[in-house]
């Protein structure tokens, strides 16, 4: 199911002892006001090279490694137990682990698990056959259809689900097809090389593989250039085009929607739908009508191989890693057990989550964090009420939305329980299992949600995920268990550090409810305008300052951040820091703190914030983030975010002569 959520790529370190470690992290040869990133964590950056298994390092990667071990420990309880009842949680975990770890059988089979489907594609003789097979295999998870049909939330009534129609086929963002920059061109070249090699690995000659790859890419390119670009796709109104089932059949008659619906076993009583992006979908119609049957077969074969390459032999996984190495700069493939842990966590996330919570997350942690969230919520309300540019009526609606936010902490109050429909059979290979899983879960979703009220209190992230998010359609903020326990959050530590780290993250998620996307949704999660026209104009003026400022930040020579694409996340950081600092000040009035190791409480707040984002990164991965992520690179979440915050200037006595100084009237004060 499609969920619109805004997540912050988080990084946490133990708060215990953080203040004592600040001095060791510093590069005191640099003034705080000249380069705060280098000042605050320069020595840490120097002493912490990147692990070869990762494209970056930092607190987030450290926690990912620790979490990997925790989840692996849960899995190991079932790894050797082959006599558990079929369908039980332990049986599913153990069986999937053994299938993933059985390199002998997987290498012996090679690409045999997908061979029946490749034969089906290769035997196609006519366009009609191609359309039929395209729909049938797409329903089995092979992504052979450059179009899609599935459940999504109704943007205007988010307590209900509806059917949405979307294009497929283009695996990269629109910019990679339209006007790719140097780094994007390199990624395209790496992907085309991967595609060709995959086609050779399933028995095609070098010449045939080259022809088939070029045919596939021609289709992908035609669709890709018609997509919304990354800035446009952030506007929810640009992806809403309601129609009826009957009108869909007339407007997009180049696609056999009835056959596709039936292949998916989707409900037959579809009335209203949303066509997310009509233009690329019309291009799909043209592609299906104008492309030769042989080229359509090439497209389908490549998509079929790519969709299940992770479940074939080592050769496919190794080649996929070489692609990842080229585009991210990672140097070593993760060992098989880590890849197995990730796969189990992806496919049995709720099952693992229940075990994770029981083992690692006490109820007391949930209550402590809840109190902290309410503290931040009050600080946000204080700032809203102090706001001088909003009218009282819009301000009142903003406060109402803030306090209507549903708060998920640690784990959901009610589990979705969709994984009970997953059946893992050890007498079948991984491909057969995952084909069945996709079909079973899709059918279960239709049974549970079609024409029935939707529970917006569901948590869109599993408890074991080290992250957090805001969901506009739910108006909910979500903090999984993995980030809310020692060493991620330490309620006994210096609260100046806690507010600077986890506090800014809580504030970040709350601020997403009022960023340039989130502000378009009302307190109930519906896409309804609640702003006065003059208020919205003033808001846009303020956020424009932030967008223009971040667009000046150069990540690599000639490669700058796109301030419009990253605006939502930058508003989140701007608001998150402001709100967390206000909450910190409120606490400071009640419980005064002294200096520690020469740092004031305010300085510790900002040093903790910088330490959260401290990371080394490969040039390739840095380029990938700038080109395809809505988050700004970590360095700019410090050096570009903090110059907009008045209290940072006060904490470190930043002067007009300092390099990072921005005049007060030029700073972006949003929330």
Task: List where the protein language model places each region.
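Hydrophobic/aromatic-rich, well-ordered segments within soluble, folded domains that form packed cores
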Residues: 25-46, 180-200, 567, 574-579
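Active-site-surrounding "flap" and adjacent substrate/cofactor-binding loops of secreted or lumenal enzymes
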Residues: 31-34, 39-105
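His/Glu-rich zincin catalytic helix
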Residues: 20-61, 173, 476, 481-483, ...
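Short, glycine/acidic-rich hinge or "gate" loops at secondary-structure transitions
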Residues: 54, 83-92, 205-215, 231-237, ...
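Noncatalytic, helix-rich "gating/capping" subdomain that lines the substrate-entry/channel surface
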Residues: 78-371, 375
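Bacterial Sec-dependent N-terminal signal peptides
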Residues: 1-20
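Intrinsically disordered, low-complexity linker/terminal regions across diverse proteins
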Residues: 64, 251-254, 274, 278, ...
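Short secondary-structure subsegments characteristic of cysteine-rich extracellular domains
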Residues: 53-75, 207-226, 498-504, 602-606
């Amino acid at each position: 199911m499609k969920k619109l959520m805004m997540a912050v790529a988080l990084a946490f370190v133990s708060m215990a002892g953080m203040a004592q470690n600040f001095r060791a992290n510093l590069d005191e040869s640099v003034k705080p006001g000249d380069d705060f990133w280098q000042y605050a964590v320069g020595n840490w950056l120097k002493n912490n090279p990147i692990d070869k298994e990762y494209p970056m390092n930092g607190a987030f990667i450290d926690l990912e490694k620790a979490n990997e071990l925790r989840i692996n420990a849960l899995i190991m309880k079932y790894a050797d137990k082959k006599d558990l009842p079929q369908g039980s949680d332990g049986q599913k975990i153990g069986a999937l682990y053994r299938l993933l770890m059985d390199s002998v059988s997987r290498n012996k089979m090679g690409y045999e698990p997908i061979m029946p489907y490749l034969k089906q594609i290769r035997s196609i003789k006519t366009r009609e056959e191609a359309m039929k097979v395209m729909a049938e295999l797409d329903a089995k998870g092979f992504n052979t259809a450059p179009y899609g049909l599935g459940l999504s939330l109704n943007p205007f009534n988010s307590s209900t689900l509806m059917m949405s129609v979307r294009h497929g086929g283009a695996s990269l963002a629109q910019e990679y097809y339209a006007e790719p920059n140097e780094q994007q061109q390199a990624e395209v070249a790496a992907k085309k090389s991967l595609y060709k090699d995959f086609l050779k690995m399933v028995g095609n000659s070098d010449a045939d593989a080259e022809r088939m790859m070029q045919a596939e890419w021609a289709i992908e390119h035609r669709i890709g250039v018609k997509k919304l670009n990354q800035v446009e796709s952030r506007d929810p109104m640009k992806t809403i085009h309601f129609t009826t089932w009957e009108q869909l059949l007339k407007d997009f008659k180049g696609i056999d929607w009835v056959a596709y619906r039936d292949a998916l076993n989707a409900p037959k009583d579809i009335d209203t739908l949303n066509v997310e992006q009509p233009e690329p979908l019309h291009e799909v119609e043209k592609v299906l009508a104008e492309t030769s049957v042989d080229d359509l077969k090439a497209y389908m074969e490549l998509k079929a191989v790519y969709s299940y390459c992770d479940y074939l032999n080592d050769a496919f996984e190794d080649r996929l890693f070489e692609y990842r190495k080229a585009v991210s700069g990672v140097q070593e493939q993760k060992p098989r057990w880590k890849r197995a842990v990730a796969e189990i966590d992806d496919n049995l996330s709720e099952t693992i989550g229940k075990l994770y919570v029981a083992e690692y997350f006490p109820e007391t942690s949930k209550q402590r964090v809840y109190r902290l969230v309410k503290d931040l919520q009050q600080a946000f309300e204080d700032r809203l009420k102090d706001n001088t540019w909003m009218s009282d009526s819009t301000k009142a609606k903003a406060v109402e939305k803030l306090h209507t936010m549903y708060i998920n902490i640690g784990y959901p109050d009610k589990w979705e329980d969709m994984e009970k429909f997953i059946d893992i059979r050890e007498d079948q290979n991984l491909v057969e299992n995952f084909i069945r899983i996709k079909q079973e879960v899709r059918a279960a979703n239709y049974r549970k949600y079609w024409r029935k009220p939707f529970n917006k209190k569901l948590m869109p992230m599993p408890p074991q995920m080290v992250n957090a998010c805001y969901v506009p359609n739910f108006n909910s903020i979500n903090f999984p268990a993995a980030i809310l326990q020692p060493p991620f959050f330490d309620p006994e530590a210096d609260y100046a550090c806690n507010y600077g780290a986890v506090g800014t993250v809580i504030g970040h998620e709350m601020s997403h409810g009022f960023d340039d996307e989130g502000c378009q949704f009302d307190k109930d999660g519906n896409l309804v305008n609640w702003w006065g026209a003059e208020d919205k104009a003033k808001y846009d003026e303020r956020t424009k300052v932030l967008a223009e400022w971040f667009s000046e930040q150069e990540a690599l020579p000639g490669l700058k951040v796109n301030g419009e694409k990253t605006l939502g996340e930058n508003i989140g950081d701007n608001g998150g820091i402001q709100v967390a600092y206000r909450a910190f000040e409120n606490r400071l009035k009640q419980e005064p703190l002294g200096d520690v190791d020469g740092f004031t409480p305010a300085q510790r707040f900002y040093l903790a914030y910088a330490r959260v984002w401290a990371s080394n990164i490969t040039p390739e991965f840095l380029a990938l983030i700038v080109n395809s992520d809505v988050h700004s690179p970590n360095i700019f979440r410090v050096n570009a975010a903090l110059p907009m915050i008045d209290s940072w200037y006060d904490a470190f006595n930043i002067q007009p002569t300092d390099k990072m100084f921005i005049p007060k009237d030029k700073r972006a004060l949003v929330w």
